[in-house]
Amino acid sequence: MSLAQPAGVTTTRRSFAGGIHPPSSKQLARDQPIEVVPTPKLVRVPLLQHVGALCEPVVKSRDEVLVGDLVGKSEAPVSAFVHASISGKVAKESAATLPNGRRVPTVPIKAGDEQLEGQELFDDIYGGEWPTLRLDLPTADLILQSVRDAGLVGMGGAAFPTHIKLALNPDRPIDTLVVNGCECEPYLTADYRLMLEAPRPIITGALLAASAVDARRIVIGVEDDKRQAAEALSTAAEATGIEVRFVKTKYPQGSERQLVPMLTGNNVPANGLPLDVGVVVVNVATAAAIARAVLRGKPMTHRIVTVTGRGVETPKNLLAPIGISYGELIEAAGGLSSDAARILAGGPMMGFTLGDLDTPVTKGTSGITALTRDDLQQIEETSCIRCGLCVDACPLNLVPTRIALAARKGAWSLAERYHIHACMECGCCAYQCPAQIPLVQLIRMGKAHLAGA
């Protein structure tokens, strides 16, 4: 694999149409170093944490497992294996409701006495040597097998199985690997802290991913309000040929459809994917996980979660085992403040309201945001005034109010005519709507109905 000459940290001055500039609120947790959560007494590892088929358990009650042991698998074309995130004894199978409302089975594990804790755990995941200049690249097949065995999924929120994304397609050759370090969702800083504190596994993982898809170019996109992170990545990438580029700080800059044109000049087709224009996109945390899976044979068992908002006492960035409860992470951040009014799985733009603090963290959980009463706009919904603000804000040039109102009326063919499935649910339209119409919720409802029709 021969990469293009590096351009260092450069700036892309173009921007995309639409989008918004909500208050970032990242200052709440941005300067908080990653902390390792003490091993909980119990984790519940969901058997569906990804796009695709549900895994079947491969362990039973009373089995002893070690951290990293396989506990669920599926032979379906689209799925991702799941692994024990702590060492201990398997308890009786239970179920949990995920933030998106789906009820899924879990593998509960009661913690044993022997666990890695604190700095030792952090170093096991992100520390040590991560070769870049003298990286002995495995074959593409070996990289894909390692990624599949490790159960890797996109950690930016989509949770699409990574081994499928990296699978070569002779009909669609890949020119560029884009590594997404934008983290444009307000409040969340997990990726920022990872880029700042552990940039080398990100660079190593990017080199491995590019080798798997035979990309000649690697570009890391970072919003221009994260200069320290970009500098850390640039230093780690020295002499590798990897470019680190600033893009405008604007929501939703981290969306593939917005990021790919900014970094490559190629527009992703309306009903297509980045690979249609020779691009594969991976999140920075996913890149680090690829390095760990391929070079160390370690599966995805932990992730960094930002616990933030004015509704928590001490916002933090926490390295936590998959399957720990949201409530335990909130307690690790000092608990809820007295004026906490709403808890979100994720951030305020694309997150889901959390109804149960016992909900387990999954591979795609990037943050927990606790909002106060002052954060919430208590304005009643009124009729659409046809102001067009939602249209101006939509980064995909859709007409959100028409889609949402068609869904509300059950006019499904009309909703499809207005391209309901093209909507990425970024929330720009709802943020701008002066009538407080729940545009995103209506569109989600419409998609759910059409998916089950």
Spans of features found by a protein language model:
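N-terminal, Lys/Arg-enriched amphipathic/low-complexity engagement segments
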Residues: 1-58
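Conserved hydrophobic positions within beta-strands
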Residues: 88-90
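Acidic low-complexity segments
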Residues: 97-160, 171, 227
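Gly-rich Lys/Arg/Thr-decorated short loops/hinges at beta-loop-alpha junctions or inter-strand turns
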Residues: 177-191, 311
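Hydrophobic alpha-helical positions that pack around
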Residues: 215-326, 332-339, 347
